[in-house]
C-alpha cells in the first residue's frame, strides 16, 4: 500500500515549492497558480492553508459555510427567541391567574370570619401566627442534626406558647374580667391568674431555659445556641408585632379591617401597576419592584383609605369596641368619629363648584394618615423580608398559599402596619376609659379591707354632695 505524501510545512516538497519564484504580474501569477494546481492538486495554495487535509477515502472535507446556511441559523435563532418570549408571557399570565384565584379565596375566607365577629378574627390571627412561626422555625432546622437531638424542636414551641400566654394575657385582661364578673368563683380564679400572670409566665420561661441547658450536647453547642437565638428573634420581630393586631381588634373591627385592607390594596395595586407599566427598578433587594408600581400603588392606597373609611364607618357592628369575650352583635354609640360632619368649601372655590361643601366622617381624615403610612412606609416591611430571603437564598418562606408563597410572605407588611395602627389609635383616637368591672377588680385585688371601707365611705360622701348640688 502506497504511503501518503508528506505535506507538512517542513517537508522537502513544500520547501521547494516555497523557494520557487513566480511572475509578479497578476495575469502571469494566475496562470502559474493554475498550472501549479493542475500539476500538484494536493499542495496548499498559501502558507495559511497548511491545515488542509489531502483527499483520501477517510479524509474529512471541510467546506466554507454558505450564506444560505447562515440565514437559516439566524431564522432558527429568531424563532427560538420569539418562542421564549411567548413562553415567558404565558408563564407570566399563568402566575397572575393563580395569584388572583388564591387572593379571591383568601378574601372570601377573611370576609366570612369578619362577619362571625371579634373572637373568630382573634382565632384567625393566632392560626396565622402559628403558621408563620412554623415556616420560620423550619428555615434554621437541619434534619441530620435534629436526629441527634430528639424532641429539641419542642423547645421552640414551648417558648412560643409562653410568649403567647404573656402577651394575650395582658391584651385581653379587661375583656376577661368583664366576662366572668357574674360568677363569683370563676371571678376569683381569673382575678388570681391575672394578678400572678407575670410570675407564671416568667417561671414557664425559666423552665424552658433549664430544659435547653439540660439538652446541650458536645459538638452541638453552636447549632443549639443558634436555635435558641433564632427562636427569640422570631418571638420579638414576628410574634410581638403581629400581636398588636389583636389589640386593634378589640378596639373595634374597623381598626383591624381598615389597616389590613390598605396593605392588601397597596400590594394588589403595586402588582398590577408594575405588571403593566413597570420599567424602572425601585430597589435591588427586590428586582421586581418598580417605581411605577410604587407610585401608582401609593396614589391608589391613599384614595382607597378615604373611601374605605366612609364605607366601613356606616356599619355599627364594625365600629363598636368589644368590652368582653362574648360573640353577639354589638350596638353602641359610635361616637363623634363616625358621625357625619359638614365641611364648607372656601369662598374662592364655591363659584367654580356646584357644591358648597362636603359631608364626611371625621374618621376619614385619620384614615388618610393610615393610608399615607401604608403606601410609603409599610412596603419597607416587604423589602426587609426580601433581604431576609436573599440572606437565606430562598424564594419564599413557604408554599402554603399558591401564587403568594407562605403566610410570612403575606404578613410582612401587615406586621409593620399593625404596630403603627395601634400606636396611632392609642395616641390620637382612643380616650382610655375603664369599666365598672375593671375598677372593682383593681379595688378588690389592690386594697385591703380597711382601705375598701374608707373608699366606700368616701364615695358615699361624694355622691351625697352631688345630690345636694354642693360638689
Swiss-Prot record:
It comes from the Eukaryota. InterPro entries: PC_trans, PC_Trfase_euk. The gene is CDS3. Pfam families: CTP_transf_1 (PF01148). It is an enzyme of class 2 (transferase). Residues 21-35 have a biased composition (Polar residues). GO terms for cellular component: membrane. Pathway: Phospholipid metabolism; CDP-diacylglycerol biosynthesis; CDP-diacylglycerol from sn-glycerol 3-phosphate: step 3/3. It is found in: Membrane. The keyword Nucleotide-binding does not apply. Requires a divalent cation for activity. GO terms for biological process: CDP-diacylglycerol biosynthetic process. Belongs to the CDS family. The keyword Metal-binding does not apply. Residues 1-72 are annotated as: Disordered. Its cofactor is Mg(2+). This is Phosphatidate cytidylyltransferase 3. GO terms for molecular function: phosphatidate cytidylyltransferase activity. The chain crosses the membrane at residues 97-116, 120-139, 149-169, 196-216, 228-250, 255-277, 293-313, 368-388.
Amino acid at each position: 500500500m502506497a504511503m501518503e505524501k508528506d505535506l507538512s510545512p517542513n517537508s522537502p516538497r513544500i520547501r521547494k515549492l516555497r523557494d520557487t519564484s513566480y511572475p509578479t504580474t497578476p495575469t502571469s501569477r494566475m496562470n502559474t497558480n493554475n498550472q501549479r494546481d493542475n500539476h500538484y492538486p494536493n499542495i496548499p495554495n498559501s502558507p495559511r492553508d497548511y491545515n488542509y487535509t489531502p483527499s483520501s477515502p477517510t479524509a474529512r472535507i471541510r467546506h466554507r459555510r454558505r450564506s444560505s446556511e447562515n440565514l437559516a441559523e439566524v431564522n432558527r435563532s429568531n424563532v427560538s427567541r420569539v418562542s421564549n418570549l411567548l413562553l415567558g408571557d404565558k408563564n407570566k399570565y399563568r402566575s397572575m391567574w393563580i395569584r388572583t384565584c388564591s387572593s379571591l379565596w383568601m378574601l372570601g375566607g377573611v370576609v366570612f370570619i369578619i362577619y362571625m365577629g371579634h373572637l373568630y378574627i382573634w382565632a384567625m390571627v393566632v392560626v396565622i401566627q402559628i403558621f408563620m412561626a412554623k415556616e420560620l422555625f423550619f428555615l434554621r432546622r437541619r434534619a441530620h442534626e435534629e436526629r441527634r437531638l430528639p424532641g429539641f424542636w419542642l423547645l421552640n414551641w414551648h417558648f412560643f406558647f409562653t410568649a403567647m400566654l404573656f402577651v394575650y394575657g395582658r391584651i385581653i385582661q379587661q375583656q376577661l374580667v368583664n366576662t366572668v364578673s357574674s360568677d363569683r368563683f370563676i371571678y376569683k380564679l381569673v382575678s388570681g391568674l391575672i394578678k400572678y400572670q407575670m410570675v407564671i409566665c416568667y417561671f414557664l420561661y425559666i423552665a424552658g431555659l433549664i430544659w435547653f441547658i439540660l439538652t446541650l450536647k458536645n459538638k452541638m453547642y453552636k447549632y443549639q445556641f443558634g436555635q435558641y437565638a433564632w427562636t427569640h428573634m422570631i418571638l420579638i420581630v414576628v410574634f410581638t408585632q403581629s400581636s398588636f393586631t389583636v389589640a386593634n381588634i378589640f378596639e373595634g373591627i374597623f381598626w383591624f379591617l381598615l389597616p389590613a385592607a390598605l396593605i392588601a390594596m397597596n400590594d394588589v395595586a403595586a402588582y398590577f401597576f408594575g405588571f403593566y407599566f413597570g420599567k424602572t427598578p425601585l430597589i435591588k433587594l427586590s428586582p421586581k419592584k418598580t417605581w411605577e408600581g410604587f407610585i401608582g400603588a401609593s396614589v391608589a392606597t391613599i384614595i382607597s383609605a378615604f373611601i374605605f373609611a366612609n364605607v366601613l364607618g356606616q356599619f355599627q357592628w364594625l365600629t363598636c369596641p368589644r368590652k368582653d369575650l362574648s360573640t353577639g352583635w354589638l350596638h353602641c354609640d359610635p361616637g363623634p368619629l363616625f358621625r357625619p360632619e359638614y365641611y364648607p368649601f372656601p369662598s374662592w372655590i364655591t363659584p367654580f363648584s356646584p357644591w358648597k361643601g362636603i359631608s364626611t366622617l371625621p374618621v376619614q381624615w385619620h384614615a388618610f394618615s393610615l393610608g399615607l403610612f401604608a403606601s410609603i412606609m409599610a412596603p419597607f416591611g416587604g423589602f426587609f423580608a426580601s433581604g431576609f430571603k436573599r440572606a437565606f437564598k430562598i424564594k419564599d418562606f413557604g408554599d402554603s398559599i399558591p401564587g403568594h408563597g407562605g403566610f410570612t410572605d403575606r404578613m410582612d407588611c401587615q406586621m409593620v402596619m399593625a404596630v403603627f395602627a395601634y400606636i396611632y389609635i392609642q395616641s390620637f383616637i382612643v380616650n382610655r376609659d375603664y369599666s365598672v368591672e375593671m375598677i372593682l377588680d383593681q379595688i378588690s385585688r389592690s386594697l385591703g379591707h380597711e382601705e375598701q371601707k374608707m373608699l366606700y365611705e368616701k364615695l358615699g360622701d361624694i355622691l351625697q354632695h352631688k345630690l345636694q348640688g354642693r360638689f
